[in-house]
Amino acid sequence: MGTLNLNGGNGAPQTTDTSVRIPAAAGSGSAGKSGSPPSQTWKAFLHNHVQGLASVDFFTVPTVSFRVLFVFIVLAHHRRRVVYFNVTEHPTAAWTAQQMLEAFPEDTAPRYLIRDRDQIYGDCFRNRLRDMDITEVLTAPQSPWQNPYAERMVGSIRRECVDHVIVLGERHLRRILNSYFDYYLGSRTHLSLAKDAPTTRVVQGPEAGEIVEIPQVGGLHHRYERSAA
């Protein structure tokens, strides 16, 4: 598969592979020299391909000893599921490429993968995606809004988790993030999911019992359920 690039002028995906063609963005005022109709906007592209879209991103977390740890996350757009994460102090293109195999074993790979233009995604990473039959979608320079799901996910992790803890090291950060993602996937509700969690929660009526409070993420958050006495 090829690589889609986002045009910095109108936000429309552009491709370097003739097997995937997305022309000028809708609303640009012209159908192009070929006379072909204008394509979907970037927002429409995200909506129309949500079932086959994933995005990746890195963010950093400092430790108590002033080391900087890099967290790599893989997010499936459908139901906002975090499908994989890992932590390292020294990320490389080879390490990042290996994470994609860990995230999508066998035939579970998405059709498109959205990422920014960081140099960490080198030849090794791009070759791995090509072998997995994944088309890269590159965001325009300095345009984090074009990768909204991943950016929002990183913001949630910071605000709801790592900004409230002192990280001791890699193992400690993995344990913290595992706890947070258990909460995020199974308990945290989303307006875009009709106030459901990424892993669907069963609606409990009053007949199910009294409401009980279950601490999660070391007490930073709580899950509320009904439980029979």
Language-model segment annotations:
Residues 1-229:
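Charged DNA-binding/catalytic regions of mobile-element recombinases
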